[in-house]
UniProtKB/Swiss-Prot annotation:
Role description: Prenyltransferase that catalyzes the transfer of the geranylgeranyl moiety of geranylgeranyl diphosphate (GGPP) to the C3 hydroxyl of sn-glycerol-1-phosphate (G1P). This reaction is the first ether-bond-formation step in the biosynthesis of archaeal membrane lipids. Cannot use sn-glycerol-3-phosphate (G3P) or dihydroxyacetonephosphate (DHAP) as substrate.
Activity versus pH, per record: Optimum pH is 6.0-9.0.
Protein name: Geranylgeranylglyceryl phosphate synthase
Family: Belongs to the GGGP/HepGP synthase family. Group II subfamily.
The entry's keywords: Cytoplasm, Lipid biosynthesis, Lipid metabolism, Magnesium, Metal-binding, Phospholipid biosynthesis, Phospholipid metabolism, Transferase
Length: 245
């Protein structure tokens, strides 16, 4: 089954949780342990990427995950090096509010031949950085959307949908002190038919409940996993929060 179909099947019944793992933060063996714990906690898939610039680390981690887990492995590339043949799909995304055309379409053009050659399912996605934006906002040379301007985010989402992007990701930034505002999530959801993904600043079940209740279809957590001494319990808390609507 294609990953996009997998998403739609789940969304017919409930919200989706994805766990983000950065290959640079641990060994492939440790990444497998984290993924297995997250799956026991209820996560629906593993996102792989982030700050990585070493394609060999990414490939080794993706390969180890492929041998040990059954949920989809989805690439979340930080640059053209973020591609591996072991993945099921890739968030093929454009950083819409970057000031640098490289992050809007340049990196995508450079990476597309590899994605095509490897036969990875490409999930067309608009990626929008919201204040404070974190590292991705700085590296991606963005103009983060102000938290009190949901209409700007909605305009970007509609433009992305008209350009054929079937997924849309609101990003507050890794380790952000607050998640994307509920008002912004709700307006974006009302204005488009895209699968809406929200990440950044989601640390607790209560956070997850607010974000899911506002309209997010998919919630992504990463930093909270890196900082948790019990990944399974933390993911279960977040997943249960999402289901408490």
């Amino acid at each position: 089954m294609k990953v996009e179909d997998y998403f739609h099947d789940i969304l017919g019944e409930r919200k989706i949780h994805l766990t983000l793992i950065d290959p640079e933060e641990q060994t492939p063996e440790e990444a497998v342990e984290i993924a297995e714990a997250a799956i026991r906690g209820g996560t629906d898939g593993i996102m792989l990427g982030g700050s990585t610039t070493d394609s060999s680390e990414l490939d080794a981690t993706a390969g180890a995950l492929r041998e040990n887990i059954d949920v989809p492995i989805i690439l979340f590339p930080g640059n053209t090096t973020g591609v591996s043949r072991h993945a099921d799909a890739i968030f093929f995304m454009s950083l819409l509010n970057s000031n640098n055309p490289y992050w809007i379409i340049g990196a995508q053009a450079l990476g597309a031949p590899a994605v095509k050659k490897m036969g990875i399912e490409a999930l067309p996605m608009g990626y929008l950085v919201v204040e404070p934006g974190g590292t991705v906002g700085w590296v991606g040379d963005t103009k983060p959307v102000p938290r009190n301007k949901p209409d700007i985010a909605a305009a970007y989402a509609m433009a992305a949908e008209f350009l054929g992007m079937r997924l849309f990701y609101l990003e507050a930034g890794s380790g952000a002190p607050q998640h994307v505002p509920e008002e912004m999530i709700s307006l974006v959801k009302r204005c488009t038919d895209q699968i809406l993904i929200v990440g950044g600043g989601i640390r607790t079940g209560a956070d997850a409940a607010r974000v899911a209740g506002a309209g997010a279809d998919i919630i992504v957590t990463g930093t909270v996993v890196e900082n948790s001494s019990n990944v399974e319990d933390k993911i279960r808390e977040i997943v249960e929060g999402m289901g408490s609507l």
